[in-house]
Amino acid sequence: MADLIFPIAPGAALAIHVALSAGIVAAIIVVATIIREKRAGARPDVPYESGILPGTPPQGPQNAPYFLIAALFVIFDMEAAILFAWAVAARDAGWVGLIEAAIFIGVLLLALIYLWVDGALDWGGPRQRK
């Protein structure tokens, strides 16, 4: 079917894909170099990690809800990927697939409601959390 739309040799298609990809990467690097903030006295050889410069005193451990929210994001993001795969095959799955997806979404909603009621989604400090 692809031959009907784009009558091109597979090797040429690969070469075009590689050239376009390299061109996009080069364009992003050039634009980033042009529009980046230029600071006087900034040392380009010093690593910059999470907003903390090397040699500064430690700021203590990260707030625990940050990692909890990150873990919950990863979990629910994977569920979105599973639902996307179901949506692609929705016609072939029929009513049985629709019922299975509804049960799956229901379980996800119950888990989200449980986390919400439990306070896992509260970003506040220890005084505000249960």
From Swiss-Prot:
It is found in: Cell inner membrane. GO terms for molecular function: NADH dehydrogenase (ubiquinone) activity; NADH:ubiquinone reductase (non-electrogenic) activity; quinone binding. Keywords: Cell inner membrane, Cell membrane, Membrane, NAD, Quinone, Translocase, Transmembrane, Transmembrane helix, Transport, Ubiquinone. Pfam families: Oxidored_q4 (PF00507). It catalyses: a quinone + NADH + 5 H(+)(in) = a quinol + NAD(+) + 4 H(+)(out). The keyword Transferase does not apply. Its EC number is 7.1.1.-. It comes from the Bacteria. GO terms for cellular component: NADH dehydrogenase complex; plasma membrane. InterPro entries: NAD(P)H_OxRDtase_bac/plastid (IPR023043), NADH_UbQ/plastoQ_OxRdtase_su3 (IPR000440), NDAH_ubi_oxred_su3_sf (IPR038430). It is a multi-pass membrane protein. NDH-1 is composed of 14 different subunits. Subunits NuoA, H, J, K, L, M, N constitute the membrane sector of the complex. Belongs to the complex I subunit 3 family. This is NADH-quinone oxidoreductase subunit A.
